[in-house]
């Protein structure tokens, strides 16, 4: 009988490490902020990095929507990485850590 972890042995997991070199793009739209950064993540037991663009858009009701776009191509599923990036961006925004 296979143990539960044996079922996931072949799945490659991408783990978020950090966002670095965050730079804000100048914009004349007050409710939309666009940033560029380097995301560092762990994949196959080594650190890799890619360029990303993320946007924080404030709605009229005060909600904030975050979108993430990878500027470099990726050849593997990155849903968990995108979710982690969005969580980090929201955390930085709340704490005032974005430029």
Pin down the residues of each PLM region.
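Short connector loops at helix/strand junctions that flank enzyme active sites
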Residues: 32-36, 47-51
